[in-house]
Amino acid sequence: MFKSFNGLELKSSENEGRYLIATRDIQIGEDLLKCKSYFAVTSETLKTTSCFNCIKQLPSVIKLSLKCNQCNEIWYCNEQCKNENINKHQHYECKFYKKLKSPKLKVYPNFDIETFTEIRMIVGLLSRYYQDILLNNKFIEQQLNNNNNNNNDNEQLTNTLDDVFDLVENQVTEESNPAAKERIDSIVEFISELFNLVLLGSTTTKSIINNDDKIEMIRKINEKSRSIIHKTRCNQFGIWTKNDKCIGVAVSPSSSYFNHSCIPNCTDVRDGSNMTFKSLYPIKKGDQLTISYIELDQPIQDRKDELKYGYYFDCICPRCNGDSNSIDSMDNWISKFYCSQKKCTGLYYSKPMIPILNTLTSNHEIQLSCSNCNNINIVTPSFFNK
């Protein structure tokens, strides 16, 4: 999956998993990596106003009118998006989405809206495992590939189902996170019931797959489901509007090569299911490339708790583990990049690449943009002095 990108090298270690380092000095605002998610879903609460294909929300409050008439669970913003996605959707997750709210399935009182968004994601991935691996019945994307060529997606890093399976997963146990363990147990049970209901109740494949084979396939799906949940919980990305509203989630294995730091040197800029990773400030050759998984403007313990219970790892970055003087210095440094807009959690970055700072005059104006809301901040080269 990971082809050569100028200035990046993929490495791995037992403690940090796979990660990226700079193989040369990197300037401010460089495009380091562009990637498209392997699979993305709209939020359960916004699915009728957000497009399932481009994962973008219409500016108006009017509900979308184009939808999948088989499952009635996904909507599209226009005919082009529907034509690009509908056949693939109906090949994979459609028949499972159709039964998500079936009265035959057990009702779990601890399932909130976010849980159903997560279930839509997991079911989408498992439906690909069912079709591509168990049935050897991959969807042919000839037309989609033609569209991708027209959109210059050859610059993007693409992902496969195997890449999803290769993601690092952090185990959730009764000891490490009992609440999360209980929720995951319920999701695993629900998904097992869903696949039993759909596959054993299906009449379309009876002529080619007998019930014994279906039961064996369901067993294999059940074996995969918990692992997939662990992987996606640690590696998925939210898709946000400029108003800081989460309209969906995406799994993009190549994006997961950027480890977390509370003093990151990169940021991710999201456009629907597409992501571009940009350098925030000059990065030296040999340094690891990092982003932040969480809101940075929080006390140390709050950040550690969010990472522990949301991503299941203990943060070892210098901003969480240094002495008080160095932590204060790092707090002051990274806080300059926080967006000034109220409630926005984005970071200021430069859209164009900026040449070496010492070649610029001291009063040279540099325009920075927020990675979330596009708010503008005009600075001078001294802004980047540590």
Swiss-Prot record:
Residue ranges of the TM segments: none
Keywords of this entry: Coiled coil, Metal-binding, Methyltransferase, S-adenosyl-L-methionine, Transferase, Zinc, Zinc-finger
Coiled-coil features, chain-numbered ranges: 136-171
Database matches in SMART domains: SET
InterPro entries reported in the protein's UniProt record: H3K4_H4K5_MeTrfase, SET_dom, SET_dom_sf, Znf_MYND
The keyword Transferase appears for this protein: yes
Zinc finger (MYND-type): 51-94
Domain SET: 6-294
Protein's recorded name: SET and MYND domain-containing protein DDB_G0273589
Enzyme class: transferase
Species per Swiss-Prot/TrEMBL record: Dictyostelium discoideum (Social amoeba)
Function comment: Probable methyltransferase.
